[in-house]
Amino acid sequence: MPEGPEIRRAADNLEAAIKGKPLTDVWFAFPQLKSYQSRLIGQHVTHVETRGKALLTHFSNDLTLYSHNQLYGVWRVVDTGEEPQTTRVLRVKLQTADKTILLYSASDIEMLTPEQLTTHPFLQRVGHDVLDPNLTPEVVKERLLSPRFRNRQFAGLLLDQAFLAGLGNYLRVEILWQVGLTGNHKAKDLNAAQLDALAHALLDIPRLSYATRGQVDENKYHGALFRFKVFHRDGEPCERCGGIIEKTTLSSRPFYWCPGCQH
């Protein structure tokens, strides 16, 4: 399943295609959404927000389209009039004069009023989004030490969207390697330096992944690019200590770690 950085990049692509442009055609597959089709014609998308792995497409008439891709949903951007060759089932079409965005295969789709937006069960449940620029390491540290989360092993906590929205398995793996901890550690057992390092890594690594993953750095001395240090690298030497990276299963997900420097 895509994690927060991939969802945010998808939102960026949708915004770049249709933000601020009048909608010329709107289509929803689900009967309960059909009545909104005519209400959205002539309106425009003001912005696309991410809340962890959910997308909120906000319209100029104050309605918001909530969508969660789960495992199979995918958004695509096409030139208006183009019909992609795909076996996927179309769920949503938002068309402007030059670009159209299409949502395929997703089943968790709703239209929300401003009032419903504040009471939606999933949105009520998720924690702060790791890509929210207003989220600070100090707030993350407070959450780590809160009674709700301080006694939970990181193996499960870092996959729990109620803790921080947008984290997923590859981020869990890379964050714990970065700070030299294992999935069995708990926040209550960390010293001040470990806690501070973890709070920063929980924000820095997702943000670096969002900003640079998949890019090629032609200027070797300019900034840092995200790359996997341990994820999917079992059997290879750890670049930090030379130990051999291992693979196991934690919280029903593949987990990669270095026994030499994560303890």
UniProtKB/Swiss-Prot annotation:
GO biological process, one term: base-excision repair
Statement: the UniProt record of this protein carries the keyword DNA-binding: yes
Binding, DNA: 70, 125, 169
Keywords: DNA damage, DNA repair, DNA-binding, Glycosidase, Hydrolase, Lyase, Metal-binding, Multifunctional enzyme, Zinc, Zinc-finger
Residues forming the catalytic site: 2 (schiff-base intermediate with dna), 3 (proton donor), 53 (proton donor), 253 (proton donor)
PROSITE patterns documented for this protein: FPG_CAT (PS51068), ZF_FPG_1 (PS01242), ZF_FPG_2 (PS51066)
Zinc finger (FPG-type): 229-263
Its EC number(s): 3.2.2.-, 4.2.99.18
Cofactor or coenzyme needed: Zn(2+)
Cofactor notes: Binds 1 zinc ion per subunit.
Molecular function terms from GO: class I DNA-(apurinic or apyrimidinic site) endonuclease activity; damaged DNA binding; oxidized pyrimidine nucleobase lesion DNA N-glycosylase activity; zinc ion binding
Catalysed conversion reaction: 2'-deoxyribonucleotide-(2'-deoxyribose 5'-phosphate)-2'-deoxyribonucleotide-DNA = a 3'-end 2'-deoxyribonucleotide-(2,3-dehydro-2,3-deoxyribose 5'-phosphate)-DNA + a 5'-end 5'-phospho-2'-deoxyribonucleoside-DNA + H(+)
DNA-binding is among the record's keywords: yes
Family: Belongs to the FPG family.
Record function comment: Involved in base excision repair of DNA damaged by oxidation or by mutagenic agents. Acts as a DNA glycosylase that recognizes and removes damaged bases. Has a preference for oxidized pyrimidines, such as thymine glycol, 5,6-dihydrouracil and 5,6-dihydrothymine. Has AP (apurinic/apyrimidinic) lyase activity and introduces nicks in the DNA strand. Cleaves the DNA backbone by beta-delta elimination to generate a single-strand break at the site of the removed base with both 3'- and 5'-phosphates.
Protein name as annotated: Endonuclease 8
Gene (UniProt): nei
